């Protein structure tokens, strides 16, 4: 149980941890229906409609290394959400793109974020301010750019 005046309640990293954990739990409830984890969801949402991305670029976009991405992409490929193809010029370079099923599911999944945040006591304006503040925090402190 969350205790407002506790030492932990004043710790930024604890508040990030609790928020992240609880938000992901809400997403998980919605994603079960599609056989997806939260990580699978963010990977699918990170690939643009007709885009081909190599694993390195995709990893940078979702802040995951290739060791985490490779097995996840294999699972997404088995579900026919993505296709992995090798470049003819350099077979070491694996390109990731959405299948038609992946594009269809991406359209369905795009509404999940709004559904999740409708369950919280937060206004649209507060949500937007929080997103902007966190984008700035990540960009300034972790030498990573969050695509806006």
Swiss-Prot record:
Q: Name one Pfam family in it.
A: Staph_reg_Sar_Rot
User: Keywords assigned by UniProt?
Assistant: Cytoplasm, DNA-binding, Transcription, Transcription regulation
UniProt GO molecular function: DNA binding; DNA-binding transcription factor activity
Give the record's GO CC terms: cytoplasm
The protein's matches in PROSITE patterns, at most eight in alphabetical order, are given as:
HTH_MARR_2
- Known DNA-binding region: 55-78
Q: Which InterPro entries does the UniProt record give?
A: HTH_MarR-typ, Transc_reg_Sar_Rot_HTH, WH-like_DNA-bd_sf, WH_DNA-bd_sf
The text of the family note is: Belongs to the SarZ family.
Q: Do you know which PANTHER family this protein is assigned to?
A: TRANSCRIPTIONAL REGULATOR, MARR, TRANSCRIPTIONAL REPRESSOR OF EMRAB OPERON
Query: Mind telling me what this protein is named?
Result: HTH-type transcriptional regulator SarZ
Please name the source species.
Staphylococcus epidermidis (strain ATCC 35984 / DSM 28319 / BCRC 17069 / CCUG 31568 / BM 3577 / RP62A)
């Amino acid at each position: 149980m969350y205790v407002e005046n506790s030492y932990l309640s004043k710790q930024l990293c604890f508040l990030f941890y609790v928020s992240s954990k609880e938000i992901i739990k809400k997403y998980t409830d919605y994603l079960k229906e599609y056989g997806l984890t939260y990580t699978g969801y963010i990977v699918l949402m990170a690939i643009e409609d007709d885009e081909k991305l190599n694993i390195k670029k995709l990893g940078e976009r979702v802040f995951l290394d290739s060791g985490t991405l490779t097995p996840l992409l294999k699972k997404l490929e088995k579900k026919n959400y993505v296709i992995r193809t090798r470049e003819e010029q350099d077979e070491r370079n694996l390109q990731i793109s959405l299948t038609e099923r992946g594009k269809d599911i991406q359209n369905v999944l795009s509404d999940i974020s709004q559904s999740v945040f409708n369950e919280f006591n937060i206004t649209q304006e507060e949500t937007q301010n929080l997103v902007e503040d966190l984008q700035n925090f990540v960009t300034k402190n972790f030498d990573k750019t969050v695509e806006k």
